[in-house]
């Protein structure tokens, strides 16, 4: 990574903290296979003759961008070449302009002149740039008539009368590219002797292939003619016009003519061969022609090389025999006759030739434009001759080999014309000329079917062995040659190395660590370039950095040499592990509302993962620490076929972990549908734990969830009635030992109140309809305490009081104060009631004073106060007589649920009965 970095020095014991040191890291040298090549403007379709431009983003071995601002750079080391669709080499491109542009790219301009679909290969230092090869399509330019080419089906300019002349007209632009489309051309035939234009009735132009027309017409008159194809409107003729041709009177029939002789059969290289040609008409009669109109072309299939034959016409004698012409004409290449005034006619020809190279030959024979053998060539094969030992050689052997290891020797057998000779393994033999032969084992030679033979041997003992290879007891050079056999420990052994590295990371390793070499001293001679990363060397240490976003397998070869110059090679197999999916987009915090599913519609936006392998199944686990995570119904989505299915489940001990499984293409939409519901009455900051997992590991991300509080009403837990002493004395109202009930007040917002319990204030009031309430209040509550007395309906603050041990005794029919929940509950635990012998009703009221939970800012989180109210029937027990106990008990059971008037009525009845 490049940039300016600070060094922070922190020492806790001596309280040292210094961050004043910094350093700068600059990009290294350009590494071709990491640098990125692309088309300028993303355009890759051009017309021939247009200027094309590519952009190169130079990077170092670690993927850092290189800036050449103010620095010199060698631009000429880039090579541009075209590869055709079938993978063959199509040519080298010459750059016309190379420059450095401000955006950080190198721009290379070049001109494209060859049409077709190609791959552009951009290389530097024999390394292909990343992103290449680039697809490229070049369309042909406009038609250039003067550059069009005509190709005759017959290579001779002589045509037999009544033949159909056929010419393939190739439409081309100015660069020689085929131009598609049907274009009109003008044809004109002129007789040479008269200079007059000859009318042709059946001129035909047929579009046979893209950019190729077939022009044809019938030759109905003998003589010498000129043919011109042109565009008369623009006064332009196609190239090589006019075409001079001769029409002669002849009746040769290619299918009835005969070719026979050993020269068209298989033969041995160097043999003189021959065959005879008998020209016949359609009725089988001899059809003589001028001898210069017979053409024989012998082509070697492998490289299209030509053999020049000798053609001799044979003269018929009174129909009973034949004799050869005295003069033997000379021929040009392709079997064409040299210029001369030969006018001899013949129908029988003898052809001789000598093939010296082995392979498949094609023999084309034609009389003028009439091709024999039905228009097809004769096929023959030439085999190698007898082995010429003087031309043979031992081409491969190793002068230093380990003992007890099978080693190989390669021998090349050639004939007298240096053709490889196959199928002769049994005639090859090993000959050991040294004295030590008892511990030496040989195997038969194996034919490699290309003239080479592989022989194997094994030496059990250390020493020098002198040997020869013989063919039919004749020694093949070099002979003898020495092979030195050493113990196995003499030679180095390189072992393959497996290396694991995370994608987008780098790893340094020494491939020689597990290799063996004598003397504990070896050096690395070199290494090949990996296909998907960079490789830097520091001594015997290599540092591999995969290309950005690449994961999978990579490899390279390396070669070592020991102190004796012995070599060994091995392969480093690199496994670039796909890192667990990373979150490329996530919110700094999610917003939610207490006790509500958030968001209300859809899910949280901004949660997205990236993963380099689009087809691998991965999983994402989502869990809230103080809540639950659910998946909202997702909208209908159209995904490409093969994108996989989404699996949704719950896991964990409490089944509160939402698990999404599938390919990254289906998980990302699901992440956009996640909803949150906090625990009951929870408000504050929660954490959403997102865990992404693949086959190589797991990655965690904690996203805060800010749960906005909602003001919950306070609550009062009291029973409907409480039984007190009947004599009207002081009685503890809420007695936990007497009444098994949780007497308490509270507020759900208190649990998550950030200011703590001491700052969560409420207003608590208690009023009794008869008698007095007595309690002992802490002195800090005096300022907020108000009292209500009998027959007074207003709350009054405490005017005078006497504090004992920071507490004040209070006696009134009503008490109201502002305090904490704990202080309210403490008051309830010590609240006394006096008087009211006939019972009373205690009313409890609790107000949260609008506390909204105060999250995050109490000044902005205040709402209208919420209240809780409860009434408790305080019943004074009276001793019952044995006579009225049963009835009294029943009345007691009936009146308990009623209100204050019911209690008064109950008391009156008790007095009357008593």
Curated annotation (Swiss-Prot):
<feature type="repeat" description="Filamin 2">
    <location>
        <begin position="391"/>
        <end position="485"/>
    </location>
</feature>
<feature type="repeat" description="Filamin 1">
    <location>
        <begin position="249"/>
        <end position="382"/>
    </location>
</feature>
<dbReference type="InterPro" id="IPR044801">
    <property type="entry name" value="Filamin"/>
</dbReference>
<dbReference type="InterPro" id="IPR014756">
    <property type="entry name" value="Ig_E-set"/>
</dbReference>
<keyword id="KW-0472">Membrane</keyword>
<dbReference type="InterPro" id="IPR013783">
    <property type="entry name" value="Ig-like_fold"/>
</dbReference>
<dbReference type="InterPro" id="IPR001298">
    <property type="entry name" value="Filamin/ABP280_rpt"/>
</dbReference>
<dbReference type="GO" id="GO:0005886">
    <property type="term" value="C:plasma membrane"/>
</dbReference>
<keyword id="KW-1003">Cell membrane</keyword>
<dbReference type="InterPro" id="IPR056434">
    <property type="entry name" value="Ig_GEX2_N"/>
</dbReference>
<protein>
    <recommendedName>
        <fullName>Protein GAMETE EXPRESSED 2</fullName>
    </recommendedName>
</protein>
<dbReference type="GO" id="GO:0048235">
    <property type="term" value="P:pollen sperm cell differentiation"/>
</dbReference>
<dbReference type="GO" id="GO:0061936">
    <property type="term" value="P:fusion of sperm to egg plasma membrane involved in double fertilization forming a zygote and endosperm"/>
</dbReference>
<keyword id="KW-0812">Transmembrane</keyword>
<dbReference type="Pfam" id="PF00630">
    <property type="entry name" value="Filamin"/>
</dbReference>
<dbReference type="GO" id="GO:0030036">
    <property type="term" value="P:actin cytoskeleton organization"/>
</dbReference>
<dbReference type="Pfam" id="PF23616">
    <property type="entry name" value="Ig_GEX2_N"/>
</dbReference>
<keyword id="KW-1133">Transmembrane helix</keyword>
<dbReference type="GO" id="GO:0051015">
    <property type="term" value="F:actin filament binding"/>
</dbReference>
<dbReference type="Pfam" id="PF17963">
    <property type="entry name" value="Big_9"/>
</dbReference>
<feature type="transmembrane region" description="Helical">
    <location>
        <begin position="893"/>
        <end position="913"/>
    </location>
</feature>
<dbReference type="InterPro" id="IPR017868">
    <property type="entry name" value="Filamin/ABP280_repeat-like"/>
</dbReference>
<keyword id="KW-0677">Repeat</keyword>
């Amino acid at each position: 990574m490049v940039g300016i970095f600070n060094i922070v020095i922190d020492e806790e014991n001596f309280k040292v903290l210094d961050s004043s040191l910094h350093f700068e890291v600059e990009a290294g040298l350009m590494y071709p296979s990491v640098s990125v090549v692309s088309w300028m403007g993303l355009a890759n379709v051009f017309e021939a003759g247009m200027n094309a431009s590519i952009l190169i983003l130079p990077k170092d071995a670690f993927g850092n961008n290189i800036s050449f601002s103010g620095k010199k750079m060698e631009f000429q080391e880039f090579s541009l070449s075209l590869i055709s669709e079938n993978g063959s080499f199509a040519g080298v491109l010459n750059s016309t302009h190379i420059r450095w542009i401000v955006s950080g790219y190198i721009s290379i301009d070049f001109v494209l002149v060859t049409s077709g679909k190609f791959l552009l290969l951009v290389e530097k230092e024999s390394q292909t740039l990343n992103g290449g090869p680039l697809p490229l399509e070049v369309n042909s330019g406009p038609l250039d008539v003067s550059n069009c080419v005509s190709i005759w089906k017959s290579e001779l300019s002589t045509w037999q009368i009544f033949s159909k002349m056929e010419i393939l007209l190739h439409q081309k632009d100015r660069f020689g590219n085929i131009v598609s489309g049907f274009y009109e051309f003008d044809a004109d035939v002129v007789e040479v002797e008269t200079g007059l234009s000859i009318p042709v009735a059946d001129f035909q132009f047929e579009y046979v292939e893209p950019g190729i027309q077939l022009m044809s017409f019938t030759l109905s008159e003998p003589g010498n003619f000129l043919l011109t194809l042109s565009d008369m409107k623009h006064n332009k003729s196609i190239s090589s016009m006019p075409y001079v041709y001769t029409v002669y009177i002849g009746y040769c029939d290619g299918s009835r003519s005969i070719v026979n002789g050993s020269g068209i059969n298989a033969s041995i290289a160097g043999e003189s061969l021959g065959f005879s040609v008998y020209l016949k008409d359609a009725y089988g009669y001899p059809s003589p022609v001028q001898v210069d109109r017979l053409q024989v072309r012998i082509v070697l299939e492998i490289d299209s090389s030509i053999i020049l034959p000798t053609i001799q016409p044979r003269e018929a004698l009174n129909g009973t025999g034949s004799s050869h012409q005295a003069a033997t004409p000379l021929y040009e290449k392709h079997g064409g006759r040299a210029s001369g005034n030969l006018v001899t006619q013949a129908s029988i020809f003898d052809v001789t030739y000598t093939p010296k190279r082995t392979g498949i030959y094609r023999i084309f024979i034609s009389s003028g434009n009439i091709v024999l053998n039905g228009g097809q060539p004769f096929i023959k094969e030439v085999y190698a001759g007898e082995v010429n030992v003087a031309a043979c050689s031992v081409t491969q052997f190793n002068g230093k080999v380990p003992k007890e290891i099978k080693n190989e020797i390669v021998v090349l057998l050639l004939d007298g014309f240096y053709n490889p000779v196959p199928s002769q393994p049994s005639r090859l033999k090993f000959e050991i000329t040294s004295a030590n032969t008892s511990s030496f084992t040989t195997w038969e030679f194996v034919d490699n079917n290309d003239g080479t033979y592989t022989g194997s041997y094994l030496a059990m003992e250390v020493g020098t062995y002198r040997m020869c290879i013989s063919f039919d007891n004749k020694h093949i050079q070099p002979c003898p040659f020495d092979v030195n056999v050493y113990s196995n420990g003499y030679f180095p052994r390189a072992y393959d190395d497996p290396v694991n590295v995370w994608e987008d990371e780098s790893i340094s390793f020494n491939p020689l660590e597990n290799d063996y070499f004598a003397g504990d001293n070896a050096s690395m001679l070199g290494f090949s370039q990996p296909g998907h990363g960079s490789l830097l060397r520091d001594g015997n240490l290599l540092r591999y950095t995969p290309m950005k976003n690449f994961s999978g397998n990579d490899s390279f070869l390396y070669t070592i040499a020991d102190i004796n110059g012995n070599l060994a090679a091995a392969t480093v197999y690199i496994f670039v592990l796909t890192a667990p999916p990373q979150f490329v987009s996530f919110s700094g915090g999610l917003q939610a509302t207490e006790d509500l599913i958030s968001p209300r519609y859809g899910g949280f936006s901004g949660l997205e993962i990236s993963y380099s392998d689009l087809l691998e199944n991965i999983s994402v686990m989502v869990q809230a620490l103080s809540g639950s995570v659910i998946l909202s119904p997702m909208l209908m989505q159209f995904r490409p076929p093969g994108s996989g299915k989404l699996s949704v489940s719950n896991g964990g001990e409490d089944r509160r972990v939402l698990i999404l499984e599938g390919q990254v293409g289906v998980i990302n939409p699901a992440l956009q549908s996640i909803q949150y519901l906090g625990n009951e009455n929870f408000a504050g900051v929660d954490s959403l734990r997102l865990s992404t997992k693949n086959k190589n590991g797991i990655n965690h991300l904690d996203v805060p969830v800010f749960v906005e509080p909602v003001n919950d009403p306070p609550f009062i837990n009291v029973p409907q009635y409480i039984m007190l002493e009947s004599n009207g004395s002081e009685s503890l109202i809420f007695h936990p030992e007497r009444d098994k009930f949780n007497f308490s007040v509270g507020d759900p917002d208190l649990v998550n109140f950030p200011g703590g319990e001491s700052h969560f204030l409420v207003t608590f009031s208690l009023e009794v309809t008869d008698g007095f309430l007595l309690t002992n209040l802490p002195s800090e509550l005096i300022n907020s305490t108000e009292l209500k007395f009998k027959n007074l309906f207003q709350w009054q603050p405490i005017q005078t009081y006497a504090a004992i041990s920071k507490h004040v005794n209070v006696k009134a029919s009503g008490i109201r104060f502002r305090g904490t929940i704990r202080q309210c509950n403490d008051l309830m635990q010590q609240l006394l009631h006096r008087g009211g012998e006939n019972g009373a009703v205690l009313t409890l009221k609790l107000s949260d004073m609008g506390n909204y939970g105060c999250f995050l800012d109490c000044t902005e989180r205040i709402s209208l106060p919420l209240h809780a109210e409860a009434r408790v029937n305080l019943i004074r027990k009276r001793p019952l007589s044995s006579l009225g106990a049963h009835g009294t008990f029943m009345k007691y059971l009936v009146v308990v649920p009623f209100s204050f008037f019911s209690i008064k009525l109950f008391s009156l009845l008790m007095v009357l009965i008593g």
